[in-house]
Design a protein with these regions (language model features):
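C-terminal peripheral helix-coil segments that are non-catalytic and often amphipathic
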Residues: 60-63, 104, 108-116, 130-174
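Secondary-structure edge/capping motif, primarily at the C-terminal ends of alpha-helices
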Residues: 39-44, 79-86, 143-147
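Gram-positive cell-envelope targeting signals
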Residues: 7, 12, 72-75, 128-130, ...
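Helix-turn-helix
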Residues: 1-23
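Short secondary-structure transition hinges
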Residues: 63-105, 127
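Hydrophobic alpha-helical connector segments
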Residues: 23, 27, 38-70, 125, ...
Length: 174
């Protein structure tokens, strides 16, 4: 109703709440990643050392914490909801497609690191990104939702996220 449409109209377009939730999350991520692509196009990956691209990605997560807490919180809730509902991979095709830009960047960044040696590649690519980038995003999401033990409501935890970023960068450099 807040969007100016009724339930009937909504469910004419989406057959279930799960389908709607997936569509909204895919649209939100695509819009955010398109904004990042405009700032630093995928085509520039060859021109930038892999570690600089890696730091840019970590900084973009901190920026999300500062300016897009709603996206981080929605994504966190999305992950729990989709898991709870038992969404099948075929239901997530559009969502995964919305992450194409990020997944492509991560892969090209890792390949660039193999060439320029600016961050470690002794760990398999998927594990490296789970341990580094995904951990950073999870921390940003938890801070955005005030899910950190001992955290105070409405406090800015950017300094702690910058510290975490520095720790991750030091790990990545080996």
């Amino acid at each position: 109703e807040a969007a100016g449409i009724g339930r009937a109209t909504l469910f004419r377009c989406y057959s279930s709440k799960l389908e709607l939730v997936i569509a909204v999350c895919a649209a939100k991520w695509k819009a955010y990643l398109d904004e990042l692509d405009a700032k630093r196009p995928i085509s520039s990956i060859g021109d930038i050392p892999a570690i600089d691209r890696f730091v840019f990605t970590l900084d973009s997560y901190i920026d999300m914490y500062q300016r897009h807490k709603d996206l981080l919180q929605y994504n966190d809730n999305f992950n729990h909801y989709v898991t709870h509902e038992g969404a099948a991979q075929e239901q997530l095709v559009d969502f995964n497609r919305s992450l194409y830009s990020a997944n492509t960047r991560f892969h090209l960044m890792y390949e660039k690191a193999k060439e320029d040696g600016t961050f470690r590649t002794d760990i398999p690519e998927d594990i490296f990104f789970r341990v580094t980038l995904h951990s950073m995003m999870a921390a940003c999401a938890h801070y955005a939702g005030d899910f950190i033990w001992g955290a105070k409501d409405n406090k800015d935890y950017t300094a702690e996220l910058i510290l975490l970023k520095e720790m991750i960068v030091n790990f990545a450099k080996g």
